[in-house]
Amino acid sequence: MKLYSWNVNGLRACMNKGFADFLAAANPDVICLQETKMQREQATFDFPGYEEYWNSAEKKGYSGTAIFTKQAPLNVTYDIGIEEHDKEGRVITAEYPDFFLVTVYTPNSQRELARLDYRMVWEEVFLAYLQKLDAIKPVVVCGDLNVAAEEIDLKNPKTNRMNAGFTDQEREKFRIFKAAGFVDTFRYLHPEEVKYSWWSYMFKAREKNAGWRIDYFMVSERIKDKVKSAEIHNDVFGSDHCPVSVELEL
């Protein structure tokens, strides 16, 4: 089963930059999107062969997630069931026979860490949500987690030490996430590889490959050996992020 995840930074904008051609060429069984930045009723496009599940933020043009899947899930739920965390369209869970697929757009801690306190609360409640699912069947979590886990995961770790996405607090929450039994598939299969999934639009960052790896596929520890590949598709344009993927044999 071939799964892709991509923060498209606005699906309508990405459609104008080749999203449909990318989808046809990659031909994933499932693709999860973050930062769709639209309501489903605004879509003037559809994707034949895929069932579509959308979770949009209450605030128009902000956040939002979607799952497009060839195989109809057994069940689909939206958000995590806690009202204060369920207004921004950040989570969709699709249940398949052998696993839960959860796509997430983790809240950004923002400039001057204005939202870091909220982010810390989010990390705890989201992990608790995943652990409940994991008690039922294995979990595959994908999306923009808004954290570079280690120094290898960003071009300039020293100068970004106190910036959103690389604070000690965010990295500690990621360590706790892994310690709870979730495996970073790319790092598991590529322990030393330097590859990024996001580049600022400023300073010609992508041209210089001054990026961050903040988009992930995480899996329950007990299915890590079912992951046959984990890739970062940094040759695909259309957003400030690039797609990431895994192939699972379940």
Q: Can you name each region flagged by the protein language model?
A:
Residues M1-F47, E51, A57-S63, Y78, ...:
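N-terminal, active-site-proximal structural segment of metallo-dependent hydrolase catalytic domains
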Residues E51, E124-A210, I214:
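Metal-dependent phosphoesterases centered on the DNase I-like endonuclease/exonuclease/phosphatase
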Residues N7, L23-E41, L101, L130-E151, ...:
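Active-site beta-strand/loop signature of hydrolases that rely on acidic residues for catalysis
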Residues M1-N9, D98-Q110, C142:
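Active-site-proximal beta-strand elements of phosphoester/diester hydrolases
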Residues K37, A43-S109:
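Structured beta-strand-rich core segments of catalytic domains in phosphoester-bond hydrolases
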Residues G81-I82, P107-E123, K158-M162:
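Surface-exposed cleft-lining segments at the edges of enzyme active sites
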Residues K70, A94-P97, S220-E221, V246-L250:
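Active-site beta-strand termini and strand-to-loop segments that position acidic
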